[in-house]
């Protein structure tokens, strides 16, 4: 079996890559990964060097896996700073490291694409052997698989990788017919408070959901602007995604994108106030980014959670992943679920820790 290292996802055709993963999960689509690279969001300069893997058998591609060589731990949402600090304290280099993940995207999904009829255990054995060899070649301390589906951790990898468990809060669709049907499952006081929040959040404000081609260029420009403002306010940076990403993502994955938006309530259309960006597939909705140009009470909950729940019910989606963290989501019908990561540490003293 031959391994090929792709310095860019575009060294593999979109038809081949997407056929190996055979899923409508949006974040592993060739177009999404390609745009991260071509927009300058993911590149050497941002500390995400593409090293994607393609496995071939007798010249026929049979498996693929996203892989990055990284010199930091930002944009991962699985925190390993304590490991990095421990390495530093012992005078050992932790970076670079190898990461199999979707950059900036803590969303559970497939991480290895395998052609039909190929034994997954065989692919995992070959990948693990090659990862160890590549880590030595590139001086990488470790390999990290972030937010894989649970099955991946119970096969070959369970013998060589450490598993870590985290918690997110997801909403599950129990065949609700509409939002009222959903809130009817709440205790009376809880339901009353939530509906009061919704009314308060839309006083003098129009809230809408836009899908695909309904999202105009000016809304993409606004989403980009408030995304950067949100990060600037939070940590003094402009965030991970560039303006070009927002300019082009609608053309790349438009049919799998929903934007919930808020405007001032005025005849002829008011000023844009806030927006939240979601992706979706046949099974779930994934809330990713939010931003606003002023503070409005409860508007974040309306655009990021309630609009997402309504959309999921309308589309008959099974679940809604509204993003990392947030125990406050429980009061809005979200439940805690386990999320996973797996880690191979080359240094024996640390791998046994």
What is the predicted role of each segment?
Residues 1-93, 132-297:
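A conserved beta-strand-loop-helix scaffold within acyl/acetyltransferase catalytic domains
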Residues 94, 119-132, 295-310, 321:
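Conserved acetyl-CoA-binding loop-helix of GNAT-fold acetyltransferases
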Residues 107-120, 290-298:
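A short, internal acetyl-CoA/4′-phosphopantetheine-binding micro-motif in the GNAT/acyltransferase core
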Residues 134, 311, 328:
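Hydrophobic/aromatic ligand-binding patch that stacks against planar heteroaromatic rings
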Residues 138-147, 312-324:
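Conserved GNAT acetyl-CoA-binding A-motif
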Residues 223, 245, 272, 287, ...:
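Extended, hydrophobic alpha-helical segments in both membrane/secreted and soluble proteins
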